[in-house]
Amino acid sequence: MNKITSSNQYFFNFKRDLNASLDNFYFSKKNEILKNELGLFINDSNAHNLFISGDKGLGKTFLLNCALNHKKFSEQKCLYIDIENLSNNVKVFNEIDSFSVICIDNIHCSNKDIEVELFNLVNKAFTSKTKLLISSQLHITQLNLFPDLLSRIKQMSCFSIEQISDDEVDDVIDFMNTKLKLFFSKELI
């Protein structure tokens, strides 16, 4: 593990966006509930753990990084693990139950050994104050995981991130124009 911006934040060196912010994510109308739940996850110490599913490229990894980057967690021990890049290294799960927030990305890529370790981690999180945010390209009903692990994940608040609709494309362009300070005129867009 590598130290990052504070003595309390760690990550495994792959796919970690240290600048991700919820302010820079366009939440379509269909994703407003997810936006609200992420806000609760970050701001409410009693909030449920979250499972987010959705197709590749919809922003799941970005949202996990947004949560970890939030100022609310800046003084807490946080961890991001991308299962897709983990291979069979189950040793990474030793002593990670001391973290306040753990984001697990691409759980659909796990193998049986990792699933057993994830099951143990989820159990520890459920009995402690550790917050979990888990993502997958597969919907909860499509996951083929160790049954006990799947059962624990189903106890989490589960959401699917939805594709932006065609009628929201102009809003997305306006959003990006503002966020990136491009200042394109309406006529150009």
What is the predicted function of each stretch?
Residues 83, 94-121, 128-139:
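Conserved P-loop NTPase "ATPase switch" module shared by AAA+ and STAND
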Residues 1-45:
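A short, basic N-terminal segment
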Residues 46-64:
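Walker A/P-loop nucleotide-binding motif
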Residues 142, 156-169:
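Conserved AAA+ ATPase "SRH/arginine-finger" region at the nucleotide-binding site
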Residues 140-154:
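Short regulatory helix/loop adjacent to the ATP-binding pocket of P-loop NTPases
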Residues 69-81:
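Post-Walker A helix-loop "phosphate-sensing" segment adjacent to the P-loop in P-loop NTPases
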Residues 169-172, 184-189:
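Short conserved motifs of the RecA-like P-loop NTPase core
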Residues 53-54, 79-88:
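A short hydrophobic beta-strand->loop->alpha-helix junction that borders the nucleotide-binding pocket
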